[in-house]
Structures are given as structure tokens and as C-alpha cells.
Amino acid sequence: MKLALDRRLFLSLAGMGAGAAALSACGGPSTAVGTGPSETALNFDGVTPAASIDFWSNHPGKSQDVEKDMIARFEAKNPGIKVNLVTAGANYEEIAQKFQTAQAAKSGLPALVVLSDVWWFRYYLNGNIIPLDSLISQLDVKLDDFRTSLVDDYKYDGQQWALPYGRSTPLFYYNKDHFAAAGLPDRAPATWQEFAEWAPKLKATTRAQYAFMHPALAGYAGWTLQNNLWGEGGSWSRDWEVTCDSAESVAALQAAQDSVYKDAWAGVSSKESADDFAAGLASATVSSTGSLIGILKSATFNVGVGFLPGGSKAKTEVCPTGGAGLGIPSGVTPEEQLAAAMFLQFVTEPENTAAFSAATGYMPTRKSADMTAVLAKTPQIKTAMDQLAVTRVQDNARAFLPGADQEMAKAAAKILTQEADVKTTMTELKATLEGLYNTDVKPKLKA
């Protein structure tokens, strides 16, 4: 069944109050319908910044130390404001759950919160976050200095709803020592077909358990498998037509299953493939750019990074973006919002985005960030920066259907850990995704 709905029309209807539960990108808590975003322009003239604010973070890319350092430097520069760093979860889903709980209780909200690049729109629909435009103007934030594709992710209806923070793409990580021992070139494979030819050589010449480790499914499947799907001309969806059961999509996922069972050169991580790779369990993996610094610190071998491989149908523009931004909740006082904006401005200054990138591997979000010293120390970060030019917008089915990410992960688990029939599993997933559309999206659009 084709879900015939233009993406732009969908978003315009949603923006008029079509319903907050209509849109979701990562897996996570369901969201009650809110009052919607306020159309009243915010005015902070005469507002004094709060003396203390809470900053909720899940410390993406193991960034707690660099976050503490930025807070200390901000407080030294602004002695009248104290920033309390709160660990609000171990990942984007957990921090979203905590934020939704605080919203429901109408208490305990932070002044600044880390939000997934695809969670912000749900918060926008619920009226949970404020537009930043008046604060951007008042504080003279140089919005045009942000990397366009990253900052534009948070623009809607002519307003800016968040600023980019820990932004990432998946990268292909490989063990240079293993590749050399197997007589392979020192680069990422151009396609998954090429890596399938390399994999037996890696297994034969190294002590690694696997040539490749698939990322953990619960947190990554819906995101990273888009790469496999796109390379074969498949997708989770095209616009609003669910296409996960197409011949191309099935072929892509069949190849992934074959790597685990038929050809037996790949494993599936139970928790974090970056850690498995750094420990030497596999010769290669796919993981976020935010895993880069951790891998480089932990690995006892020479680490290589490259663009994600293409497939038989597409060899470029097969990489999705991801990561997190920072938003300011609507349910806190104007004084807290102003103080949060001042800290947000500080965190996103060029030198601080460079420092954050150096500490984590995430992409610097400012064009003017001086990355010379960072790249001299960690040249691998440039690969992530370069890959940004060939990324692709995520599929609508993952980005806007509530609960779709979990369903994709469940389907991937059946295929990659239970050897379920791929076509049958994708047919079932299609029915589930169409059900989500008909139940949670279509009724809202008629409202």
C-alpha cells in the first residue's frame, strides 16, 4: 500500500496542530498530544539571567569531562550563573524518557537539554521547547557560521528550535594491522560486495573472531541499516510509501544475514560494536563518529576510518546523519531560558565546538572552528567532516512514524540473530509500519 502523502504537506499539517504523536524518529517513550507550539514572539528585554540552571545531558561520545570543562570556563566568564550538569540518561532514549516524565509532572525541567536530532520535532509539536530566534538575535549568535546542513535540521516554520551539538554520521572503522596482514589495501571498502571478498582473507589471517561486527540492533539498526538498504536501491520508505519489503530492500538485508550465517564472517554486537572492535573481536565495524576518540584511546592497534561502503546500485550518498542538538524547554522561567541561551551560545562558539570534536570525534558544528590542532592530533576526524558532503536525509518511515525505530530493530534482530526469512520479516514490518501510519498519523491529519 502506498501512503500517498507529500512530506511537505505532512509537515505543514503537523505544524498546524495535527498531533504530537504523529512524529518520532528514534525509539523511545510515547508522547501525549500537547498544546502545540506558541505563536507568541518571545521577548527577553529586561530579563535577568537565572543564578542557577540545570543542563541535562547523556554525555554523547563520553563527553562528560569536556562538558565539565566548558561549564567551568563559562562560570568563570559569567560568575553570576551556575550550571549544574545532570546525567539524565545513558542514551538519547533515556534522556527523552526523563524529559517526558518531567513534562508530564510539570516540574523538575532542565533549562537546557540534549535532544536527538530527530526528537526535537516531537518536542516542537508538543510545545515543549521554545524558538531560539529572539535569543539568537539578542545574544548575537552567528547562525550563518554554523554548518548549514546541521543547523538547518532544527529549522521549521521559519524559526530555529535547537542548535547542533554532538552531530555525527556512521563511519567504517577497520583494523589497519589486520588489513595489512591479509594483504588488503589500507582503506575502507568501496562497496559491501568488495568487503565480502575481503572478509575470508581477514578471517584466515587474523585472530579476530569476526571480519566484521554489525552494530547493536537496539540502538543502531534503523539508523545504520539505511546504508545497506540505500546501496542496493532499497529503503525503509520512499517519501511516505513503505518500501522495506521491496526486492531491493530484501536483497540488501539478505546479504547482511548471509554475512552472519551463510558466509559466517560477521557477528552482531550485543551492546556496542565500537567496544567490540576496539577489543579486537572484529577486524571492522560501523559506528558513530562519536565513538572515534574512545576507539582510538582503547584500541591497541592502528585504527583506520573511512566512508560507509556503497552497494551494487549506489556507491555514494549512502550515509545518514545523526546525533544530537541542544534545546531550551518552554516550561522554565524566562530567567532560566536566558541563562540557558547564554550557556548554549558559549558551548557552540567555534573554539568550544573544536574542543568538543577533539574530545569525542563528533563533527565541529561551526564553519570557523579552527581544527588545525585537532586534525594534527586526530586526522581521522576529517573523514567524518568530508563524509558530511555525501550524506542523505533519513527515510520518512524511520524519522516520523512513532515507534518505527523499535520495530525496525525487532525485525533486524529476527533476520540477523534468529535467521528468520527476510522477505517474510520485511512483509510483516511493512504491515506494522503502515499500521503505525494509519493509527498514529492519518487520524491526526484529518483532525
Q: Where in the sequence are the language-model features?
A:
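Long, aromatic- and glycine/proline-rich binding clefts that accommodate carbohydrate-like moieties
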Residues: 149, 153, 306, 358-410, ...
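Short, solvent-exposed loop/beta-turn-alpha elements that line the ligand-binding surface or hinge
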Residues: 43-46, 133-146, 210-216, 232-252, ...
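A structural signal for short loop-to-beta-strand junctions that line the ligand-binding cleft
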Residues: 101, 109-113, 139-179, 315-318, ...
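Extracytoplasmic "Venus flytrap"/periplasmic binding protein-like
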Residues: 73-146, 181-183, 283-284, 294, ...
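Extracytoplasmic/periplasmic substrate-recognition and gating elements
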Residues: 76-77, 100, 182, 254, ...
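N-terminal secretory signal peptides and thylakoid transit peptides that target proteins
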Residues: 1-21
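Hinge/lid segment of periplasmic solute-binding proteins
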Residues: 35-45, 117-169, 221-224, 304-306, ...
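Glycine-centered hinge/linker elements that transmit conformational signals in sensory
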Residues: 198-203, 239-267
